Amino acid sequence: MRGLSTKPVAIIIAILTVHFLFAAVTSQSSGDFVPIESKCNGTIAECSLSTAEEEFEMDSEINRRILATTKYISYGALRRNTVPCSRRGASYYNCRRGAQANPYSRGCSAITRCRR
């Protein structure tokens, strides 16, 4: 088995070099992959302050998803500095000792693989 000869490898390297040089010369970008226009025309300090304010004004995707799961806010959640139920694994709505957090209420079927 012979190794690769140097002539085809040199030709491939030359073609790739010419291709990349041609692409670099004809590109419209100034080094960025995606041209982005600046929205702020002030100083760096002014622009960074406006960006920080916008960051806290926008609601995060996670907050929107969490709030979208329920259509109401309970009175307990509106009280200040309180934990709804401090018992580990207990339901917020049923904080009694021994109460199940998520009681199983579906019937038994082959799909759920429950014991009979």
Swiss-Prot record:
<comment type="similarity">
    <text>Belongs to the plant rapid alkalinization factor (RALF) family.</text>
</comment>
<dbReference type="GO" id="GO:0048046">
    <property type="term" value="C:apoplast"/>
</dbReference>
<keyword id="KW-1015">Disulfide bond</keyword>
<dbReference type="GO" id="GO:0007267">
    <property type="term" value="P:cell-cell signaling"/>
</dbReference>
<dbReference type="GO" id="GO:0019722">
    <property type="term" value="P:calcium-mediated signaling"/>
</dbReference>
<feature type="disulfide bond">
    <location>
        <begin position="108"/>
        <end position="114"/>
    </location>
</feature>
<feature type="signal peptide">
    <location>
        <begin position="1"/>
        <end position="23"/>
    </location>
</feature>
<keyword id="KW-0964">Secreted</keyword>
<keyword id="KW-0325">Glycoprotein</keyword>
<dbReference type="GO" id="GO:0009506">
    <property type="term" value="C:plasmodesma"/>
</dbReference>
<keyword id="KW-0372">Hormone</keyword>
<feature type="site" description="Required for proteolytic cleavage">
    <location>
        <begin position="64"/>
        <end position="65"/>
    </location>
</feature>
<dbReference type="GO" id="GO:0005179">
    <property type="term" value="F:hormone activity"/>
</dbReference>
<keyword id="KW-0732">Signal</keyword>
<feature type="glycosylation site" description="N-linked (GlcNAc...) asparagine">
    <location>
        <position position="41"/>
    </location>
</feature>
<dbReference type="Pfam" id="PF05498">
    <property type="entry name" value="RALF"/>
</dbReference>
<comment type="function">
    <text>Cell signaling peptide that may regulate plant stress, growth, and development. Mediates a rapid alkalinization of extracellular space by mediating a transient increase in the cytoplasmic Ca(2+) concentration leading to a calcium-dependent signaling events through a cell surface receptor and a concomitant activation of some intracellular mitogen-activated protein kinases.</text>
</comment>
<dbReference type="GO" id="GO:0009505">
    <property type="term" value="C:plant-type cell wall"/>
</dbReference>
<feature type="disulfide bond">
    <location>
        <begin position="85"/>
        <end position="95"/>
    </location>
</feature>
<feature type="propeptide" description="Removed in mature form">
    <location>
        <begin position="24"/>
        <end position="67"/>
    </location>
</feature>
<protein>
    <recommendedName>
        <fullName>Protein RALF-like 33</fullName>
    </recommendedName>
</protein>
<dbReference type="GO" id="GO:0040008">
    <property type="term" value="P:regulation of growth"/>
</dbReference>
<dbReference type="InterPro" id="IPR008801">
    <property type="entry name" value="RALF"/>
</dbReference>
